[in-house]
Regions:
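Intrinsically disordered, compositionally biased low-complexity regions
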Residues: 128-130
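Extracellular/periplasmic, surface-exposed regions of secreted and cell-surface proteins
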Residues: 1-7, 11-17, 21, 25-26, ...
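Acidic-leaning, charged glycine-interspersed low-complexity segments
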Residues: 132-134
């Protein structure tokens, strides 16, 4: 919405209401079992014993888990229901300052997601028909009943505020710049209550029972960044660009949270030079562009190494519900024994890890022939990851201590290679066509360092 000639605002709302209802299939991979049943059951394997729909026919399970598909109905097997709701609100504003080319922009987004999933897996019998006695005999009973209730809530907040500058001086000098701040925060709550076997199959509620299990988790993710970029070009022939990010992640110990990651790139359009346009080479090479770039990017290992570096691993503490033992409630008396939930020490805090850095260097050129109908692109690149977490091999704790050595940003790997692309693009009357050929060759190197003591 254009409020004035200099001020513009916008607002957007997105939402989704989704419900999935399926049979509550048993097993860890229910749909895989159904798919195997479709492809492996042959027509002679009847769904009902003696073709009587009141009695499910017993089919011996195959090696890949194929079963009688007639049992996989909501009335017989139970119901799986998933209710998913989302809403996203976003607002943006733009203000053109009195300084020509300088614009202020802001973006704020709110996202809410809720998931409610219920599972009610029933038991059933499968039969074989005896023609001699005309009896239906139970051949198999599915007894592993299950009832579960899952509730998942997620809230995300994201904001970005930037100053943007774009101006051309004296028709030939193009200057651009961006400076800003952005943040992201996510709060997630997850709760699962389950009962197996089910105490009361006739009521779809989870009653208080010794078979109940409860799983609850809470997670908060927070990141922040300062960003900048500055670019300059002269007649679009000489192009140079500088950029950088100063990122912070909740994953690391205060003091190791921030990392700076710069980048620079440049290009020279040789074919725009007057001496080139006047040369004979321009008759068959219509365009030439030389370019090079170097950039760095940070990785806080939120996904790659989450198992070896869990959330808040830099804090000391204990892990509850880690093992247990049956001990007496009163060792000095005659109290009965009871199971006691165990608590384990988390180990030495991981205080030595910080950002993993990914650096990328690229040198290449673009060439066009026959008025750019034939194009050639070649890139020589090298990508290096440094600071990959690894366990030092020259630090040893006594086995009796029960401690593991802290991981450190020790290792690195490198991928280098050449990318090439040839493209022919032409038009015949109203028909456009193109042919592209891509070729690449890579080389991978790994490097392992020892710890510095």
């Amino acid at each position: 919405m254009q409020l004035t000639d200099k001020f513009k605002v916008g607002f957007q709302t997105l939402g989704k209401i989704e419900q999935n209802v399926n049979p509550a299939l048993p097993g860890g991979d229910d749909y895989f079992q159904m798919r195997n049943s479709i492809f492996n059951l042959i027509p002679t394997m009847r769904p009902y014993a003696n073709d009587n729909p009141d009695y499910l026919n017993y089919i011996t399970p195959t090696h890949d888990g194929a079963r009688n598909m007639a049992a996989y109905t909501i009335d017989n097997a139970g119901k799986h229901q998933k209710d998913f709701r989302t809403i996203q609100l976003s607002a943006n504003l733009e203000y053109k300052t009195p300084l020509p080319g300088l614009t202020a922009k802001g973006l704020l987004s709110y996202y809410y997601e809720t998931l409610h999933q219920t599972d009610n897996e029933k038991s059933w019998n499968e039969y074989r028909y005896d023609p001699a006695t005309q009896e239906y005999k139970v051949a198999s009973t599915k007894t592993d009943t299950y009832r579960g209730d899952v509730r998942n809530h997620k809230v995300e907040m994201m904001g970005q505020f930037t100053l943007n500058y774009d101006h051309i001086f004296a028709k030939d000098h193009h200057v651009t710049a961006v400076a800003g701040f952005e943040f992201f925060k996510e709060d997630r709550k997850y709760l699962t209550v389950a009962q197996s076997p089910v105490e009361n199959p006739f009521v779809e509620n989870i009653t208080t029972n010794a078979n109940n299990t409860v799983s609850n988790s809470v997670r908060t993710i927070t990141t922040a960044s300062f960003i900048f970029r500055a670019g300059y070009s002269y007649k679009e022939k000489y192009i140079i660009d500088f950029a950088g990010r100063y990122d912070a992640s909740w994953r690391f110990l205060p003091g190791n949270q921030w990392g700076f990651f710069p980048s620079v790139s440049g290009a020279w359009r040789l074919s725009e030079e007057e001496f080139y346009k006047d040369s004979k080479v321009a008759d068959w090479i219509s365009s030439i562009k030389l370019r090079a770039s170097y950039g760095e990017m940070g990785d806080d290992m939120a996904r790659n190494f989450n198992s070896s570096y869990p959330d808040f691993a830099y804090l000391p503490g204990y892990a509850f519900n880690n093992g247990g033992a049956i001990i007496s409630n009163n060792p000095l008396g005659n109290a009965p024994d009871a199971y006691t939930t165990g608590t384990a020490y988390k180990g030495i805090p991981q205080t030595g890890l910080s950002w993993m850095k990914i650096s990328m260097m690229n040198v290449g050129f673009d060439m066009g022939f026959l008025n750019d109908r034939l194009k050639l692109e070649v890139d020589f690149f090298k990508r290096k990851r440094s600071g990959i977490p690894a366990t030092p091999t020259d630090i040893i704790y006594p086995y009796e201590a029960g401690y593991s050595v802290q991981k450190q940003n020790l290792n690195s790997d490198q991928v280098s290679g050449i990318d090439g692309m040839v493209r022919w693009n032409d038009r015949v009357n109203d028909f456009n066509y193109f042919v592209t050929r891509v070729r690449d060759k890579d080389c991978v190197k790994n490097r392992v360092k020892r710890a510095k003591i």
